[in-house]
């Protein structure tokens, strides 16, 4: 059992009072309870809007407006919405358990018209956990939400996997999808269907018996039998067409002779003139073509000479440019040679200065050492001289002081004081407080010993310091060498750096030694590279002259080819004379042959026309006479076979027609007698009961009932028994089955179903095994399916029969054509084509003439080729020795490699030259760098301390010496004593002064000598430094000059530069000789061009004269050709045999045809006028216009439905074949198309009977319905009396009215309307046409009257009218009618939707408070029995124990209006009250 689809919920978003509210719908009844204005009608309006979003239909009015035709401007929808985006959606689960959300987006449109914009959409595949409000709104706060726009809704839904969103621009598409998914019960194809559905919903919503529905119950309940109407319309159209075609055939037969005569004479008249003009035009064109060929040849020769001129000019320009480049290169090479020579001289200077600089460097280093030693000695001598001077000065001062004291008496006291001071100074210096003048001498010995020790210690330290200074100077020297070579390095890394420098020194020396060999190798490779470049330039020039690129390895093969070409060209020149004589002889023979073939061509062309016509008609390639004879025999055999096959097809078609007639019987009765027997027995054919069985179930029921499927179902077999006694007109086997036709099922048999078969237990000892038929015929669907196949087969057989009949007649006519051909043309038809031979001979003649004309040109070309080949061989002789050089691809790489090696070697040589001496000095000092004498500073400090100690000891000893020396002053007691002592002292002082002066003199002399020597050394050093700096600066300048020269000055540079200059000089000489040669050739070419231009001007003048004549005639001829081709008559007019007739013969032929045509078109004014205009000989196009007018006239008279061509000539052929056959076939077809009035009556009667049975079945579902005093509701179906009479007359008395149905002037519909008027003369048909009335009479619905009846109280069955019923009874009765309509729609649409879909059923009822409790209970029961959902609205909860009830209360809070909703499930379900959901604002 298929589960019926259900509406799960209704969701309103942004409606008045409903921001986001979802109403869960009960499976049976959903009640909306609330006071006035609570929002019940708004909720229902939202549901209806989502169901039928058609603004032309929607009109939500109050029940007080029921029946009103006009309401408020917005029809009740605009005021129910709030500003912004609004939604109304329905959540549906169909029979396939698919969840579908269908709904609409509504939005108020600004303006005074209060319009609303509606956009329907669907969402499929949404998970059940997601509620509609979740996808329609977006939460933006704790108690706030935002309504999504339709685009945002689409984007959010499409982001979910497996969910589909679809928006509709058409309500039809929206309803089509809803029907396919089982949401609505009927396919709403048009606005009329939508209107019916809306009226149904509206009637349900407002309750009561809707007059809009009861008045048109036939449209709601009875399906339109469009198939029957269309069949009648197609049949009548076919009859009309058939009669028109027959009439056209009769007209066309009378035109056939006129076609033949008119086409034949018009063709002769126009074709003769057409071919005459064509011949004349060809003669003029041939003359023009001869001149044009000469003109084109001259132009070609001129173009060739101009091309040669351009090429030579270009080559001359290239040679001139190359000469300029070569002169520039030659000058550059000469300059380069001068630079190389200058650089060589510069290099010699540099080498000379470098040797001088090396010698100066060595001498400068030696002189530096000498100056350093002299400087040390000078410093010692200066120190000694200074000490001597100091000692002399001191002695002199002492002596001066003493003598001065002698002059003054107080000198003694001064000396005594000086002695005391000297004693105190000695005590302080010697730190001897106990020192006295007496013991001073003893202490003097002690301190002199100390001084001796300090001096010895100082000497030892000085020796050590000198050794350390030597080591330190070596380290510093080595370190400075490393820095000068490698740049700044740390002292700790000096040894490692020096070791690396010395390790790399041998390899750099080796590289430096390779400079000269590498220079020689590079010079050699560069010379080869230049030679290769020159060879490539020669190859490029050679390829340019040859016009083709060659590879070096191809040159030898090319040389052999050129040599063979030279030989061939020399031979071809010798053969030219003999070839010229042969061509002239052949040209004469061709002219004679062409004359012979021209005489034979017309006869052969006539035979070929006949042969090609035979080939086209027979479809065979007739290549010889034997094939013609064989083909004629095959035609006889084909005619016999085709005739036999045509008769077989006719028999098969008759059999199919009989089968179609049998299957077309109403109610599926294959035997028409069964219908009469069923009416006689008061039963129903079993096939009629199962008429609605589906195509899939037809094989099962066909096998189930077996032979009894053609039986009759009767209510009681005993009542039939007596009627069987005298029964004669019946089938051999008649099956009668007892059962109720209204509720018949297949339970009368015990059945076991097998694979594609059934076993039926007829009795205990009798079983029947029946297989499913391959082609079931049980049920209307199966019969219609079989009939469709039979109709297609019959159509194909009819087409095949027509084709075969045409082929038979065509074969007969073709046989006659073969007979005529054999008698007239067989002798010459299969000869060779003279025109083809003439064309070949003309082609050959043209070739020979062109060959003769081109002979000299070819000789000249051969001579040019000979010269070019010789030049090519000469160039190849120069190139071939250079092939190996051209193939050396590695030469440039090797030059680059050697260049890199030379650069590296030169860098090494420069390094050795710059740092070689330093590396030589550094090598023996490498070990010194391993250890840095770090104690040198400490030793210096010790030395300084020893010096201090020694100086202090000297000072102490000197102080003691002074005390000892002044010891006498301590004894000055008197003057005499003092003088004596002073005299001794004076002598000593003078003695010491003499010694000191002598020492000073020696020191001064020695200092002067050393100073002169030191000055001499410094002068030598300065001279050396000056010479060194001058030579170094000069060397830098020379090196910079060499760099500025930019030339590599090696041993072979000058030889290479000189060789390069000589090569360029030779190339320049060759180029100049070639340029002179080109200038001579260019002069000769210009003279030749002048001669050709004179000849060309003469040819152009002659050609333009003759071409002007051709062009003058061409304008009319082009118009003629355009008309001929545009109208497709070229094949008729261009008759090749006429091309061999002269102009007089063609004029005679045209004049004879003109006379015949004047008589033929005498009765046709248009053709007569056109013919008269065509007689103008100066306007040939008018003859073509006449021919086209004749064709157009005949083409317009061809019946395209009979003859399958628009060519009158072919039409004549087809007319004679088709006319007889079509006349016979169409007459037979008209007889078959004629409709039996009895069959029409049976079809309409059976259709009425089937619909009566269907309505009885619908009535059974309403038998138990009761509302108030109404105990039952039913639908009564009656046939109108006048229409019933018409059916009786059609079936029983049709012979009396055959004057209507056999008339060729009336269609069947018109005849039916005339019969209806004849039977009912009292009826006024108004202004309607008989055709319209007849079409209405073919619609079975117009035969029926439908009435709704109720069984009410004591009145019994009476017509249901609102005035006779209470409000509740009227509502219940109307609801029952609506349920019946919905059921009828579902049955009617069952074939259109999927088998696994059972559509949703839902109706509305507003203001349900008008029903009492019993009526409400009846509604609940009706919903439960019919699986229907119902939404009702009432001010109070009318049935809380069942269904789902929503309590609606409209409230206003802070100027915001909202509806408070509380849901309540029925008590019977024992489900707690649904929680109240606060409204989101």
From Swiss-Prot:
UniProt feature coiled coil, ranges: 338-480, 509-604, 780-805, 835-1116, 1210-1265
Chain residues that bind ATP: 34-41
Xref: SUPFAM superfamilies: P-loop containing nucleoside triphosphate hydrolases
Pfam families: MukB, MukB_hinge, SbcC_Walker_B
BP term (GO), one: chromosome segregation
Region (Flexible hinge): 666-783
Primary subcellular site in the record, as a coarse category: cytoplasm
Keywords: ATP-binding, Cell cycle, Cell division, Chromosome partition, Coiled coil, Cytoplasm, DNA condensation, DNA-binding, Nucleotide-binding
Record-stated family: Belongs to the SMC family. MukB subfamily.
NCBIfam families assigned: PRK04863.1
Free-text function comment from the UniProt entry: Plays a central role in chromosome condensation, segregation and cell cycle progression. Functions as a homodimer, which is essential for chromosome partition. Involved in negative DNA supercoiling in vivo, and by this means organize and compact chromosomes. May achieve or facilitate chromosome segregation by condensation DNA from both sides of a centrally located replisome during cell division.
Domain notes: The hinge domain, which separates the large intramolecular coiled coil regions, allows the homodimerization, forming a V-shaped homodimer.
Protein name per the record: Chromosome partition protein MukB
Organismal lineage: Bacteria, Pseudomonadati, Pseudomonadota, Gammaproteobacteria, Enterobacterales
Gene it is expressed from: mukB
């Amino acid at each position: 059992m298929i589960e019926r689809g259900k509406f799960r919920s209704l969701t309103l978003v942004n409606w008045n009072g409903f921001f986001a509210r979802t109403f869960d719908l009960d499976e049976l009844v959903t009640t909306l309870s609330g006071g006035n204005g609570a929002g019940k009608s708004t909720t229902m309006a939202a549901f209806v809007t989502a169901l039928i979003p058609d603004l032309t239909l929607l009109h939500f009015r109050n029940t007080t407006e029921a029946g009103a035709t006009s309401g408020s401007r917005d029809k009740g929808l605009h005021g129910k919405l709030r500003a912004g985006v609004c939604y109304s959606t329905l959540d549906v689960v169909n029979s396939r358990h698919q969840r579908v959300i269908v709904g609409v987006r509504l939005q108020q449109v600004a303006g005074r018209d209060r319009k609303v914009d509606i956009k329907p959409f669907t969402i499929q595949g949404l998970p059940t956990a997601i509620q509609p409000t979740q996808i329609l709104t977006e939460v933006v706060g704790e108690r706030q939400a935002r309504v999504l726009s339709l685009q945002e809704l689409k984007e959010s839904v499409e982001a979910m996997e497996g969910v589909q969103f679809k928006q509709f621009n058409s309500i039809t598409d929206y309803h089509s999808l809803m029907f396919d998914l089982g949401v609505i019960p009927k396919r709403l194809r048009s606005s009329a269907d939508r209107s019916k559905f809306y009226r149904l919903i509206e009637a349900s919503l407002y309750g009561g018996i809707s007059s809009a529905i009861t008045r048109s119950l036939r449209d709601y309940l009875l399906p339109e039998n469009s198939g029957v109407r269309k069949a009648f319309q197609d049949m009548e159209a076919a009859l009309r067409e058939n009669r028109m075609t027959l009439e056209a055939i009769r007209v066309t037969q009378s035109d056939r002779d006129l076609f033949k005569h008119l086409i034949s004479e018009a063709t002769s008249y126009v074709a003769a003139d057409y071919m005459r003009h064509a011949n004349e035009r060809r003669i003029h064109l041939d003359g023009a073509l001869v001149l044009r060929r000469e003109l084109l040849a001259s132009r070609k020769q001129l173009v060739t000479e101009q091309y040669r001129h351009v090429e030579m000019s270009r080559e001359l320009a290239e040679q001139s440019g190359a000469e300029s480049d070569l002169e520039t290169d030659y000058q550059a090479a000469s300059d380069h040679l001068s630079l190389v020579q200058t650089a060589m001289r510069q290099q010699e200077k540099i080498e000379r200065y470098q040797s001088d600089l090396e010698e100066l460097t060595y001498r400068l280093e030696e002189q530096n050492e000498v100056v350093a030693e002299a400087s040390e000695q000078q410093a010692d001598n200066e120190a000694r001289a200074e000490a001597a001077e100091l000692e002399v000065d001191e002695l002199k001062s002492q002596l001066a002081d003493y003598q001065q004291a002698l002059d003054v008496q107080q000198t003694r006291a001064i000396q005594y004081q000086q002695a005391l001071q000297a004693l105190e100074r000695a005590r302080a210096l010697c730190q001897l407080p106990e020192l006295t003048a007496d013991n001073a001498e003893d202490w003097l010995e002690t301190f002199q010993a100390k001084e001796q020790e300090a001096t010895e210690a100082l000497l030892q330290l000085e020796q050590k310091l000198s050794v350390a200074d030597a080591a330190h100077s070596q380290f510093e020297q080595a370190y400075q060498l490393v820095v000068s070579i490698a740049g700044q390095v740390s002292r700790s890394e000096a040894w490692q750096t020096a070791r690396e420098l010395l390790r790399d020194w041998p390899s750099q020396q080796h590289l430096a030694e390779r400079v000269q060999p590498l220079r020689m190798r590079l010079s050699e490779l560069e010379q080869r590279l230049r030679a290769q470049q020159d060879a490539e330039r020669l190859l490029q020039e050679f390829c340019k002259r040859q016009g083709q690129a060659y590879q070096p390895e191809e040159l030898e093969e090319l040389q052999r080819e050129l040599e063979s070409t030279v030989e061939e060209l020399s031979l071809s020149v010798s053969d030219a004379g003999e070839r010229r004589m042969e061509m002239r002889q052949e040209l004469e023979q061709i002219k004679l042959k062409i004359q012979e073939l021209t005489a034979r061509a017309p006869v052969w062309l006539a035979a070929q026309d006949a042969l090609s016509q035979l080939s086209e008609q027979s479809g065979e390639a007739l290549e010889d006479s034997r094939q013609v004879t064989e083909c004629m025999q095959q035609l006889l055999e084909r005619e016999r076979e085709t005739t036999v096959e045509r008769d077989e097809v006719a028999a098969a078609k008759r059999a199919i027609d009989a089968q179609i007639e049998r299957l077309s019987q109403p109610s599926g009765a294959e035997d028409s007698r069964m219908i009469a027997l069923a009416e006689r027995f008061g039963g129903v054919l079993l096939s009629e009961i199962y008429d609605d069985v589906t195509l899939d179930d037809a094989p099962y029921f066909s096998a189930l009932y077996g032979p009894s499927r053609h039986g009759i179902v009767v209510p009681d077999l005993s009542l039939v028994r007596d009627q069987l006694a005298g029964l004669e007109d019946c089938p051999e086997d008649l099956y009668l089955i007892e059962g109720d036709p209204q509720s018949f099922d297949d339970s009368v048999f015990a059945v076991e179903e097998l694979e594609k078969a059934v076993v039926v237990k007829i009795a205990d000892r009798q079983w029947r095994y029946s297989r499913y038929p391959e082609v079931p015929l049980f049920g209307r669907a199966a019969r219609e399916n079989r009939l469709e196949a039979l109709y297609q087969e019959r159509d194909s057989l009819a087409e095949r029969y027509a084709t075969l009949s045409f082929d038979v007649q065509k074969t007969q006519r073709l046989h006659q054509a073969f007979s005529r051909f054999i008698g007239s043309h067989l002798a010459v038809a299969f000869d060779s084509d003279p025109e083809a031979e003439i064309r070949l001979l003309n082609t050959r003649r043209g070739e020979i003439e062109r060959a003769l004309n081109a002979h000299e040109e070819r000789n000249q070309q051969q001579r040019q080729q000979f010269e070019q080949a010789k030049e090519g061989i000469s160039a190849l002789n120069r190139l071939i020795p250079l092939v190996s050089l051209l193939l050396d691809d590695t030469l440039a790489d090797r030059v680059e490699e050697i260049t890199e090696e030379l650069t590296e070697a030169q860098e090494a040589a420069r390094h050795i030259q710059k740092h070689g001496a330093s590396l030589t000095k550094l090598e023996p000092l490498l070990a010194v760098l391993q250890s840095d004498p770090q104690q040198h500073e400490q030793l210096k400090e010790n030395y300084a301390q020893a010096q201090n100690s020694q100086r202090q000891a000297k000072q102490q000893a000197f102080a003691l010496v002074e005390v000892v020396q002044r010891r006498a002053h301590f004894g000055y007691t008197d003057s005499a004593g003092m003088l004596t002592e002073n005299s001794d002292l004076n002598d000593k002082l003078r003695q010491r002064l003499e010694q000191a002066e002598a020492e000073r003199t020696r020191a001064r002399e020695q200092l002067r000598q050393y100073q002169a020597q030191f000055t001499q050394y410094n002068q030598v050093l300065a001279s050396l430094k000056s010479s060194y700096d001058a030579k170094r600066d000069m060397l830098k300048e020379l090196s910079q000059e060499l760099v500025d020269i930019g030339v590599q000055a090696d041993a072979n540079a000058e030889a290479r530069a000189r060789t390069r200059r000589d090569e360029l000089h030779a190339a320049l000489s060759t180029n100049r000789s070639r340029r002179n040669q080109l200038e001579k050739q260019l002069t000769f070419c210009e003279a030749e061009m002048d001669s050709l231009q004179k000849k060309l001007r003469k040819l152009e003048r002659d050609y333009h004269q003759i071409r002007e004549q051709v062009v003058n005639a061409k304008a009319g001829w082009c118009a003629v050709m355009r008309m001929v081709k545009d109208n497709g008559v070229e094949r008729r007019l261009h008759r090749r045999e006429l091309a061999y007739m002269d102009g007089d013969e063609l004029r005679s032929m045209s004049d004879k045809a003109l006379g015949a045509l004047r008589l033929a078109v005498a009765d046709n004014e248009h053709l007569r006028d056109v013919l008269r205009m065509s007689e103008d000989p100066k306007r040939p196009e008018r003859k073509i216009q006449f021919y086209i007018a004749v064709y157009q006239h005949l083409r317009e008279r061809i019946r395209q439905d009979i003859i399958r061509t628009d060519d009158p000539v072919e039409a004549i052929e087809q007319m004679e074949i088709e006319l007889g056959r079509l006349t016979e076939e169409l007459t037979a077809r008209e007889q078959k198309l004629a409709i039996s009035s009895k069959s029409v009556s049976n079809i309409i009667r059976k259709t009425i009977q089937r619909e009566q049975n269907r309505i009885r079945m619908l009535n059974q579902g309403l038998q138990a319905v009761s509302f108030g005093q109404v105990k039952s509701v039913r639908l009564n179906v009656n046939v109108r009396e006048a229409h019933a009479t018409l059916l009786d007359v059609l079936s029983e008395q049709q012979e009396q009215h055959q004057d209507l149905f056999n008339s060729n002037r009336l269609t069947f519909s018109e005849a039916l309307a005339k019969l209806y008027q004849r039977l009912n003369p009292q009826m006024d048909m108004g202004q309607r046409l008989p055709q319209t009335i007849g079409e209405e009479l073919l619609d079975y619905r117009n035969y029926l009257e439908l009435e709704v009846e109720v069984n009410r109280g004591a009145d019994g069955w009476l017509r249901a009218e609102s005035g006779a019923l209470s409000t509740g009874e009227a509502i219940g009765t109307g609801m029952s009618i609506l349920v019946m309509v919905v059921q009828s729609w579902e049955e009617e649409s069952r074939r259109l939707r999927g088998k696994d879909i059972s559509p949703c059923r839902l109706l509305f009822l507003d203001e349900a408070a008008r029903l009492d409790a019993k009526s409400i209970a009846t509604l609940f029961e009706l919903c439960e029995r019919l699986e229907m959902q119902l939404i009702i609205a009432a001010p109070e909860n009318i049935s809380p124990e069942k269904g789902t009830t929503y309590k609606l209360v409209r409230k206003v809070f802070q100027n915001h209006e909202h509806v408070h909703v509380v849901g309540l499930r029925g008590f019977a379900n024992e489900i707690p009250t649904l929680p109240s959901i606060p409204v989101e604002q």
